[in-house]
Amino acid sequence: MIYNLSFWRILRISIFIIFLFNFTYVCNIKYNVINKKNVSLVSDTLICREKRQKWWLWKTPSFLKRHSFSRIIKCCDKEQNNIGHFKKSICSLNYIPSFNLLLLLKKWEGLIKKKKNNHNFYEIAHNKITRNINSNWHLSGKGDINDYTKENDSNIYKDEEYNKNQYNDNKNDDTLNKDIVSIANSNLNNEMLHKYNIEQKNVRNFCILAHIDSGKSTLADRFLELTNTIKKKRMQDQFLDMMALERERGITIKLKAVRMNYKNYIFNLIDTPGHFDFYHEVKRSLNVCEGAILLIDGGKGIQAQTLNIFLEIKKHNIKIIPVINKIDLNTCIYDKICDDLVNKFDFKKEEILKISAKYGNNVENVFQRIITDIPYPPIKSNTFFRGVVFDSFYDQYKGVILIIKVLNGFLKKKQKIYFINSKKSYIIQEVGYLTPSMKPTDIIYQGDIAYISSNIRNFDDIEISETIINHDVVQINEQKKKIHINIKKSDFYNTLTNTDQHISNAINSDMDNPVSINFDNKENENLINIKETRCNPEYDLHYSDKKDVVMETNTIKEMSQIENSNIGTDKMHEKNEEFDEINIKDIAADKIDIAYPSVYCNIYSMNDKKCKELEVALNKLKLNDTSFSFKTDICETLGKGFKCGFNGLLHLNIIQERIKREYNVETIITAPSVNYLVKVKEKYIDKKLKAKLIEKNFDINSINIDVGNSESVKKEANETKTQNGMFFMTSNSNDIPQKNYIEHIYEPYVKTNIITPEEYQKHIMNECFKRRGIFIKKEHINDQIIFTFDMPLSEILINFLDEIKSSTKGFGSMSYENYIIYKQSDLYKIHIYINNKCIESLTFIAHKLNYQEKSKTLVSKLKSLINPHQFLIVIQAAIGSNVFVSEKIKPLKKNVTAKCYGGDITRRRKLLEKQNEGKKKMFTIGKVKLPPGIFTKLFNIKDK
């Protein structure tokens, strides 16, 4: 009992001492202010409400830290009487928040309840990003202010006997500074980036490029093994080829990014496809890498795609490491390939590495060359975040996942980002690295290849090569622009207080240092009147709706005079004309080259009920495939479908197969076609054709036309209607009018490279001339020849590569550039009729030199693919009304005379005549059923 009494006595004495200490501390500050010690130094800064009683200084650490006053606490502790130093500390932050939040009025006997109608604060909202927001707090490593205060604010208000409504009122007052406080301190950014720049010099971004079947995925497997990125239990061949189609066909379809750690280095590897139908994936990879491994098959040597890839790498001006793979083969021609690389590609012999990716021989040497030869990502001084999207995919839980390269700055969760092209804003939900599965992290830095998730569900908001920046940059730019315009319009300069001048000058001069102002000179100080000010929506410096006064004495009256701390200030905002606006488009990343579709066809769902599912599937596939495009199309026979663009027939087949496997939608595809440029004679334009032409109008300046007087043609085509006719572009042969309506048709040509052994050059020449190729040049590399032809795109789509392979016994290879030139051609529109009914989906365009051969081949294939019916089927090919090819499918036979085993012959004749009449009737009204996969078989869209 005695112990308890002594304990309570000691506790009471301790509480009294603490209270007395706080009371003395506050009274000391209050005494200096009330007795006008240095009042001229703070009179225009310490602004609060008028009260008849004494004042109380709010000094709760959580409150002050939340509003960036940690320096003020420190200064007050050291020099309690130096109010001038107190003000310098505020200004030296380059950040002046609402000062009503600094001083909270209280009665000496108790708290004054804060009523809404008595809310007469003089609020100064800065709305400008600051470079020194509470740097002491951040750099001390104690965490985020918001995280610290989130737990403590509610308890602080409760401890001060605020009720729930009062707490909410105070929280609403604090929202003025919420956005500003959340902006990262640029000094902190610089320190973080400086720390990371040391590590950034150990980052290497590179990709593996090669012709198909050269061992790219196998080399990537060895990289994963040697860096211990994947555990041995999980490791399997072609690990990065995660799609089932890739494993079945043994080809890479999509680029794959993976982050690996090797010793003290970070390797960001991108594995790319080798087939030229997916060449756009290679281009995207080169845009985000500082180096590339050029892999060559040791058994086959330099191939057509190897040459194209080398030229593409040279355009991007990045470091190339030549590597010869498959040296373990007995047929390896290492010396010959070395000579070709030295003579043709200007490599030095000591630069060329030889490895066996299958067995891992010499792969460690590749790592050393990556470290020494490939430069680290460029280090930029800009601290704001900027990144470029080079790939994306859809996750059913997280929405659209973006794969980006961080160009400068850093990005972390809960930051708000802005898409420059789509002008959309999102909040980051997750950031992380691909290892190769998604591994979340707290923050990503410049130079990193990483993924971000923002729960994006609208597919149209995202496009490849989109530039992402920190939303604060956009917000600050708009605020600076608004302040500049509003202050420029303002006639209110001379009535603003001295604090307003510091804010505006700091904003308009990119935050001049207010510490340089002489606050201690009190000679010849001017007197200004405190006038009634009301809220003006035009100003970015907001004023209270009530009357504002300045604390001067114990009792303050309206319209009283105070001393101005600055000398000779006649006009405020002298620097309001100086304003550097940030052009958001100027900070956008360079546009990534996008491969536009070269092959078009229509896709329809076999089940009309799944048309919506087909559209969703196409949207998701379009996310990570820049060369794939689609739009809605309506067909009379097949219903609603989609006109789709592809980069080749293999690309078409892959998309069709992915729709079937991943989205469970069976589809029908029409005949593949290319874009034709058509010029129509004006006198033959009817209303129907005119409506189509208006829909097809485009800027012909973006089209490369190979004609004698191309400039005059382009100038003529830019006008929608001219004396000679109109231009339009279409891939649908049904949109092309009759021959006599057309003045010219322009056909797309592409530059094609064919590499073959010298002994097969005659076969290659014959095949190219047969397909209307235009010879350009040929080059010799040892015993191989590189042919360059201008080939019609429509001719090389179907079976051309197969013919090259068969002509050269598998040693030849072919690739073409995705650069199209339109040449004038004599083309015919071929209609296919089945039982006198035109089948629009089978209509095609052919040249006058081979239209008969193509038509005969197509009709004979149709005859073999269509099953016999109970009536006669006639298949015809025609140009207009002129039928030049015809085939018949005989009807199924039924022995109607089998029951006539005797009697008069007239009975047998009557039964046969009745059968013939029925077949004639069925011929006119019967419908021919075409097999679902007829177009795939008809146009040889094979699984290559």
Curated annotation (Swiss-Prot):
Keyword Membrane: yes
Annotated membrane topology: Peripheral membrane protein
Top-level taxon of the source organism: Eukaryota
Residue ranges constituting the tr-type G domain according to the UniProt record: 201-379
UniProt: GTP binding residues: 210-217, 271-275, 325-328
Gene3D superfamilies per UniProt: 3.30.70.240, Elongation factor 4, C-terminal domain, Elongation Factor G (Translational Gtpase), domain 3, P-loop containing nucleotide triphosphate hydrolases, Translation factors
Protein biosynthesis among keywords: yes
Gene Ontology, cellular component aspect: mitochondrial inner membrane; mitochondrial matrix
GO biological process terms held by the UniProt record: positive regulation of translation; translation
Keywords: GTP-binding, Hydrolase, Membrane, Mitochondrion, Mitochondrion inner membrane, Nucleotide-binding, Protein biosynthesis
Disulfide bridge positions per record: none
Principal location class: mitochondrion
CDD domains: EF4_II, lepA_C
Catalyzed reactions per annotation: GTP + H2O = GDP + phosphate + H(+)
Cell compartment(s), UniProt: Mitochondrion inner membrane
Molecular-function GO term, any one: GTP binding
E.C. number(s) listed in UniProt: 3.6.5.-
Function: Promotes mitochondrial protein synthesis. May act as a fidelity factor of the translation reaction, by catalyzing a one-codon backward translocation of tRNAs on improperly translocated ribosomes. Binds to mitochondrial ribosomes in a GTP-dependent manner.
Protein family per UniProt: Belongs to the TRAFAC class translation factor GTPase superfamily. Classic translation factor GTPase family. LepA subfamily.
Note: This protein may be expected to contain an N-terminal transit peptide but none has been predicted.
Protein name: Translation factor GUF1 homolog, mitochondrial
Organism of provenance: Plasmodium yoelii yoelii
Taxon lineage: Eukaryota, Sar, Alveolata, Apicomplexa, Aconoidasida
